[in-house]
């Protein structure tokens, strides 16, 4: 083992598709590399890898999961690439995100080439846990350390396989949200709402679009990303010129839109284990209206650093948006508190905690190997002298 700690970060989701887990994998990897840890990300990619430290494992297949469509790669070719990468790289530690999701993370557990740290992100329920409980439970014994990103995520995995879990909330690369130039509203005084999330039922975009009908005519809405409901929603609301359909944004453009918006809205209905999008808005200095979900309450407190409303309530959402769009004093109070709250979710702080776990697991493994070598030497010395002489007699001569 060299002096430089080598970590294999394995993600089951395609890095070519925006998503919360993918963002955490890449952000955490960047911070760890900046700290001098050699991290290589193993993940599916449906295009060029997003960074030089990414090993692409093949293309993904859209798969239904947790009320969403996940870009997974459970095919045999992806698993063969995973096996090859794990074998050739000889990582000191393997860090799996969503370890029991079909694809490379499951393969990495079966390979078990190094101590494994596992981070669980999902909340709510999981078909993988329900239908694969026995093999998942057996495989869980190979996990050296378990992390859940929220209490909800811990509750889900503990319900099926038990065990001890450390709760480490997700992180945000704070400097990026404070240094990017803001993209101005259509006109400087135009009240503007920003939505950024997959266009599917659980994200609540339907509710926000319906609420727009109750807001003043001057209010503008930026709708980023896309999804299975995009065509239907655009057909239904496309005539409203106040709604701007932006499509998928780069990280830089997303941050600029956050900083340029008056209010960020996260109207999700369910299935949110942790509110990273809220931390991003807080870090960017943008006021927030969001659904009062457990995952979002991990981050935000109503009337302290955000306004939280009942999920799916169009009237309540419209009322909260109108109030925050036009109350400058309230917005300033919430954004100031939000920026302070975001400090608790620094990606650098999260990376330092994980780095300490990597070093501990590496040291534990080295100690076990040393004890094993000593025990082997002791057993050899205790063997009869005649047996040792036979070993020497039949030992192959060196070539």
Where are these regions (language model features)?
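Nucleotide-activated donor-binding/catalytic signature segment of Leloir-type glycosyltransferases, i.e.
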Residues: 231-253
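Conserved acidic donor-binding segment of nucleotide-sugar-dependent glycosyltransferases
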Residues: 302-303, 307-314, 323-329
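Conserved donor-binding/catalytic core segment of Leloir-type glycosyltransferases
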Residues: 184-203, 209-216, 222
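N-terminal strand-loop element at the rim of the active site
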Residues: 4-5, 11-18, 25-77, 84-85, ...
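Membrane-proximal helix-turn-helix segments that form the acceptor-binding/catalytic region
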Residues: 124-146, 153, 159-160
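A short, well-ordered alpha-helix in the C-terminal region of glycosyltransferases
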Residues: 330-344, 356, 372
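Short hydrophobic beta-strand element within catalytic cores of glycosyltransferases
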Residues: 287-290
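Carbohydrate-associated surface elements
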Residues: 152, 171
């Amino acid at each position: 083992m060299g002096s430089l700690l080598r970590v294999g970060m394995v993600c089951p989701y395609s890095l070519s598709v925006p998503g919360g887990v993918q963002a955490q994998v890449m952000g955490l990897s960047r911070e760890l590399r900046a700290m001098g840890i050699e991290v290589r990300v193993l993940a599916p990619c449906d295009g060029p890898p997003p960074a030089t430290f990414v090993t692409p494992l093949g293309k993904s297949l859209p798969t239904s999961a947790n009320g969403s469509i996940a870009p997974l790669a459970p095919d045999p070719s992806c698993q063969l690439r995973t096996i090859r990468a794990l074998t050739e790289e000889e990582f000191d530690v393997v860090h799996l995100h969503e370890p029991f999701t079909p694809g490379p993370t499951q393969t990495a557990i079966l390979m078990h080439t190094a101590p494994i740290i596992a981070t669980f992100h999902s909340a709510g329920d999981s078909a993988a846990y329900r239908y694969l409980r026995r093999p998942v439970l057996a495989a869980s014994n190979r996990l050296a350390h378990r992390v859940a990103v929220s209490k909800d995520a811990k509750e889900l995995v503990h319900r099926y396989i038990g065990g001890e879990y450390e709760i480490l909330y997700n992180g945000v690369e704070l400097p990026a949200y404070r240094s990017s130039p803001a993209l101005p509203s259509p006109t400087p005084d135009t009240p503007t709402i920003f939505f950024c999330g997959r266009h599917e039922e659980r994200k609540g975009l339907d509710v926000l679009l319906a609420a727009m009908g109750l807001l003043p005519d001057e209010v503008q809405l930026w709708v980023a990303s896309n999804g299975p409901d995009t065509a239907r929603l655009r057909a239904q609301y496309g005539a409203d010129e106040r709604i701007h359909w932006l499509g998928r944004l780069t990280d830089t453009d997303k941050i600029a839109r956050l900083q340029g918006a008056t209010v960020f809205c996260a109207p999700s209905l369910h299935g949110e284990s942790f509110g990273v999008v809220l931390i991003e808005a807080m870090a960017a200095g943008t006021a927030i209206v969001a659904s009062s979900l457990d995952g979002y309450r991990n981050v935000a407190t109503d009337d302290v650093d955000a306004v939280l409303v009942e999920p799916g309530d169009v009237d309540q959402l419209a009322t909260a948006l109108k109030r925050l769009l036009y109350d400058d004093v309230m917005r300033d109070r919430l954004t100031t508190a939000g920026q302070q709250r975001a400090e608790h979710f620094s990606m650098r702080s999260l990376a330092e905690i994980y780095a300490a776990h990597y070093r501990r697991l590496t040291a534990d493994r080295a100690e076990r190997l040393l004890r094993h070598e000593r025990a082997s030497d002791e057993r050899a010395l205790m063997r009869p002298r005649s047996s040792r002489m036979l070993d020497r007699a039949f030992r192959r001569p060196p070539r």
